Curated annotation (Swiss-Prot):
Residues at which FMN binds: A21, K45, S46, N129, K166, V195, G224, G251, G252, G273, T274
Source organism phylogeny: Eukaryota, Discoba, Euglenozoa, Kinetoplastea, Metakinetoplastina
Thermal characteristics: Optimum temperature is 37 degrees Celsius.
Protein family (similarity comment): Belongs to the dihydroorotate dehydrogenase family. Type 1 subfamily.
Gene Ontology biological process terms, A to Z: 'de novo' pyrimidine nucleobase biosynthetic process; 'de novo' UMP biosynthetic process
Result, substituting L222I: In alleles DHOD2 and DHOD3
Residues at which substrate binds: K45, N69, S70, M71, G72, L73, N129, N134, N196, S197
Enzyme class: oxidoreductase
CDD domains: DHOD_1A_like
GO molecular function per UniProt: dihydroorotate dehydrogenase (fumarate) activity
Pathway listed: Pyrimidine metabolism; UMP biosynthesis via de novo pathway
Protein name according to UniProt: Dihydroorotate dehydrogenase (fumarate)
Gene that encodes the chain: pyr4
Length: 314
């Protein structure tokens, strides 16, 4: 009998699928919609301590091969997501991750201090976003390894519970090595989500001769099919370099086969962003069916049988 069930982080997940932070998770209605879907888990919108409107529109555009966005962290503010986690979420349905993306170390520390008692009581899991590429004047923390170390030190100290980190994509072997070495200094970091959008792409419409989003002169994070190979590389790089941590795959998942590739590269959970935005929450049922079909064809009964088993050419 084939099974997509997982036991991770002291939680049971019916399957490895969840949304990516930012998609279908900003409002209470969104979060209830994700809870009602067949996903194995959900994560809330990356939040800041105060509500944010984000960047001016248009700030998201989808194409056949993916999407570009420069949302700028629009969110309802930490108090809303904390209240959802403490009072509103039905944990009997599926586990909840809460994503925070404070614009300073101090802001993150203040939020995780307040989250800790709720996490202890309810079991909500923290995903610390160190990789938003779309806040003007705020560079991605995880591209500055000393800053990343400081954030992880301070959050580990203030939170005192297991948590995960949402990473940007890296493109250099030396950066994989350094980033993994920093992560490995922190035993409370139990999972690493690879990857956030590929920052600062530029999409131009040939007809109008114009960029397609307004913020940052049209520069924005790329998602979707454009980034699948980059996401797989990052998943596999951190899977190999962080043997004591889980890796969550994110980027370019439109089909069960895409998810299969993420798991083959080393992913435990698989997050869906652009394709969920475009197709809606019904996508999770389709992804589960397609993944089970591939497993049946290949004779795999559990995800563990092929996780991280990608073959290299000798």
């Amino acid at each position: 009998m084939m099974c997509l069930k997982l036991n991770l982080l002291d939680h049971v997940f019916a399957n490895p699928f969840m949304n990516a932070a930012g998609v279908l998770c900003s409002t209470e209605e969104d979060l209830r919609c994700m809870t009602a879907s067949s996903s194995g888990a959900l994560v809330s919108k990356s939040c800041t301590s105060a509500p944010r409107d984000g960047n001016p529109e248009p700030r998201y555009m989808a194409f056949p091969l993916g999407s570009i966005n420069s949302m700028g962290l629009p969110n309802l503010g930490f108090d809303f997501y904390l209240k959802y986690a403490s009072d509103l979420h039905d944990y009997s349905k599926k586990p909840l991750f809460l994503s925070i993306s404070g614009l300073s170390v101090e802001e993150n520390v203040a939020m995780v201090r307040r989250l800790a008692p709720v996490a202890q009581e309810k079991g909500v899991l923290l995903e610390l976003n160190l990789s938003c590429p779309n806040v003007p004047g705020k560079p991605q923390v995880a591209y500055d390894f000393e800053a990343m170390r400081t954030y992880l030190q301070q959050v580990s100290l203030a939170y005192g519970l297991p948590f995960g980190v949402k990473m940007p994509p890296y493109f250099d072997i030396a950066h994989f090595d350094t980033a993994a070495a920093v992560l490995n200094e922190f035993p409370l970091v139990k999972f690493v989500t690879c990857v956030n959008s590929v920052g600062n792409g530029l999409v131009i419409d040939a007809e109008s001769e114009s960029v397609v989003i307004k913020p940052k002169q049209g520069f924005g994070g790329l998602g979707g099919k454009y980034i699948l190979p980059t996401a797989l590389a990052n998943v596999n790089a951190f899977y190999r370099r962080c043997p004591d941590k889980l890796v969550f795959g994110c980027g370019g998942v439109y089909s069960g086969e895409d998810a299969f590739l993420h798991i083959l590269a080393g992913a435990s959970m698989v997050q869906v962003g652009t394709a969920l935005q475009e197709e809606g929450p019904g996508i999770f049922t389709r992804l589960e069916d397609e993944l089970l079909e591939i497993m049946a064809r290949k004779g795999y009964r559990t995800l563990e049988e092929f996780r991280g088993r990608v073959k290299t050419i000798e």
